[in-house]
């Protein structure tokens, strides 16, 4: 029974990590299609990550649901990171 539960939880964790990585790759590929230089792309990624993380942490401290207001312009906040929709 315990082994089955551990296996199910492990598979769920792997699935979450895989999904997150896939979303990051998709966001990067969509940005690359626009034709932004790598330096600008890195700056945008860093800015979105910081904005989203700060916004989520502030809202969590107030015991409210994280509404992720900082991600705009085709971005959404997921796992405290902005990803391209």
Curated annotation (Swiss-Prot):
UniProt keyword annotation of Disulfide bond present: yes
Summary of the tissues where the protein is detected: Expressed by the venom gland.
Subcellular location: Secreted
Keyword field contains Signal: yes
Keywords associated with the record: Disulfide bond, Neurotoxin, Postsynaptic neurotoxin, Secreted, Signal, Toxin
Pfam families: Toxin_20
Signal peptide extent: 1-22
S-S bonds: 52-66, 56-77, 71-82
InterPro entries: Hwtx-2-like
Any one GO MF annotation of this record: toxin activity
Propeptide: 23-48
UniProt superkingdom: Eukaryota
Major localization class: secreted
GO CC term (a single one): host cell postsynaptic membrane
Annotated function: Postsynaptic neurotoxin.
Sequence similarity: Belongs to the neurotoxin 12 (Hwtx-2) family. 02 (Hwtx-2) subfamily.
Name of this chain's protein: U4-theraphotoxin-Hhn1d
């Amino acid at each position: 029974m315990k082994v089955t539960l551990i296996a199910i939880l492990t598979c769920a964790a792997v699935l979450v990590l895989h999904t997150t990585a896939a979303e990051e790759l998709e966001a990067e590929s969509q940005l690359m299609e626009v034709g932004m230089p790598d330096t600008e792309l890195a700056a945008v990624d860093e800015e979105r990550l910081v904005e989203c993380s700060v916004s989520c942490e502030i809202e969590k401290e107030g015991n409210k649901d994280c509404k992720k207001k900082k991600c705009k312009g085709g971005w959404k906040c997921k796992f405290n990171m902005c990803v391209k929709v």
